[in-house]
Amino acid sequence: MQIQRLCFIAASIFLPASALACSSCGCTLSSDWDSQGLSASSGFRLDLRYDFIDQSQLRSGTGSVDRGNIALPTDREIEQGTINRYTTLGIDYSPNANWGVNLQLPYVDRTHQTIAEGDTMASSSQSNGVGDVRIMARYQGFTAQHDVGIQFGLKLPSGRHDDVFASGPQTGEPIDRGLQPGSGTTDLLLGVYKFGALNQDFDWFAQGIAQVALDSRDDFRTGASLNLNTGLRYMANPTFTPELQLNARVSRRDTGAQADVGNSGGTLIDLSPGVTAQINRSLHAYAFMQVPLFQRVNGFQLAPHWTASVGVRYAF
C-alpha cells in the first residue's frame, strides 16, 4: 500500500490531489488562500494545478529500508517506486461573503513498479484516468470579518479501481487498491478553518479537515484521516508573495479483504515553502516544494523525498 493514502491532501480537498494530495497520493499542500475560498470576497475562481510526486524511498516505521539487504524471493511485497502526476481543475464559487462551494476534478497519471511476494522480478503498471471528484461547501458567516468557517462535503467514487499490472510476473493481476485512480468509496469531508492578518505585511491561516469513508466497495474501505495545516505569507509586495506552510496528516489503516491492512496508515508532517506571482489583476501563478519533516508509516510503504506543485488561478 502506497503512502499516498497518507499524503493528500488538504491539497486534494481544495485543489488536489489530491492533491487534499493531490488526489489520493502526494502532497498535503494548501496551495492558495483565495482559490480555496479562504477569503471574504465573492465570485468565481478557476484553478489549474499540476503535482509531481516521485515515491522512490521505501520506509518502515520512522526509518528507510535498504532494498539491497532484502534477499529475493521473500515473503512480502517489496515496492520499487511509484511516480504520480496529478492535474486538477478546481472550480470555486462564492455568491456572497458567507457561503461558497468548491469542486475538484482530478486527472491521475501514475506508473508503479514492485516485486510481489514470492517473485524475483519486478511487475509494472500504468494508470491514467479521472480520479475521485470532491465537492465541498463552506459557511463563514460566524463573525463580521468572515474569517472563521466550516466546510462539509463528499468525495465521490468517480475514479475507476480495476487497473491491473501491464508487465512482469503479475501481468493481468489487479494492482493495490491504494494505487488505483479511485478508491471506490464515498467519503464524508468535514473541516474548520480560520484566517487573518498578523499585521499589515503578514497574514496567516489554520485549517483542520477530517475524511471518513461512508461505505466500502469490493471489500475495501479507506482508513479515516485528519489533515492539519497552517501557513504564513508575506504581503508587502502584491506582485510577489512568498509563503511557508506546515502540513500534517494522520491516517488510520485501510480495512477489508482487498486492503493491504498491514502496509497502510501512518503520520506525515511536511514543510512547504512557495511563492505566488500576480500576472495581472485576475490571474496569478504559484509554485511550491514540499519536503518531509517527519514520516511514520505502518509496515512497508513508499515515500517521496520531495514533491513539487505549480498552478495558475483566475478570479472573475
Q: Which residues does each predicted region cover?
A:
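Outer-membrane beta-barrel biogenesis signature
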Residues: 20-68, 145, 157-162, 177
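Extracellular loop and loop/strand-boundary signature of outer-membrane beta-barrel proteins
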Residues: 33, 73-77, 118-125, 175-180, ...
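Residues on the lipid-exposed face of transmembrane beta-strands in outer-membrane beta-barrel proteins
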Residues: 36, 48-50, 89-93, 103, ...
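Residues that define the transmembrane beta-barrel architecture of outer-membrane proteins
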Residues: 40-42, 83-87, 127-133, 146, ...
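Repeated loop/turn-to-beta-strand initiation elements of outer-membrane beta-barrel proteins
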Residues: 44, 99-101, 145-148, 200-204, ...
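Transmembrane beta-barrel strands of outer-membrane/channel proteins
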Residues: 44-52, 103-107, 150-156, 206-210, ...
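Outer membrane beta-barrel transmembrane domains
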Residues: 59-69, 216-316
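Outer-membrane pore/translocation modules
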Residues: 107-222
